Amino acid sequence: MRLAQPLLRRKLHKRAQAEPLYGQFIEERFGHYTQSARQDWIWIHAVSLGEARTAAILLEGLRRAMPGMRLLLTNGTATGREEGCKLLQDGDVQVWQPWDSPDVLDRFFLAFKPKMGLLLETEVWPLLVQRAQVHGVPTMLVNARMSGKSMQQAQRWPALMRPAYAGLSAVFAQTQDDASRLKTLGAKVQGIFGNLKFDAKPDAVQLALGQSWRHQLTAPLVMLASSREGEESSWLEAW
């Protein structure tokens, strides 16, 4: 894995030509940080834009339940990092997702010593879960989802994926179907809690704009938002 690091660096520099943020803080991806080691971080991994927005909803409850909590936020994409930056308060830290390599992950856990890890939706990385166990960091999958296709892909690599899902301390599923598939992979599903995204509260400006558009419509309008692969065709068949 260490031999592949130059290739990853080259890929990041190339991607930074279109999205400059990919070229910043590259060393964080390899477990090298400027922050000093502290303990008791609540670590949330929100890989991209959608997960970062879900993390905002989750954080509202966490900060109420744990006043003064210190957030360690990791992201994998530039859009995720940009959105995640909006969630930071004084004392919080944001770094890139560490590469799924034993030495990199060990440096990450030794640097921050998180109290727990909350992974959002589908972000289960075998080595990440395994090294978290080694370092005594309980990890949980929140707002968890698992499509039939993703389950089939995971089942092709049982030696890797089953220990990863079984190694999670707890899993909180969105739907009954998600829960059943996750249990099939060995996950400790604690229950069905719906989709956190439905708890989002639009601000007053958005609500007013929506009402304005609605009053201007002269014909019925149907909108599909945040659809998954295959859902558009199913909707068209139903109509």
Show which residues each predicted segment covers.
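Generic structural signal for well-ordered alpha-helices
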Residues: 59, 236-239
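Active-site and donor-binding regions of nucleotide-sugar-utilizing enzymes
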Residues: 9-32, 36-207, 227-229
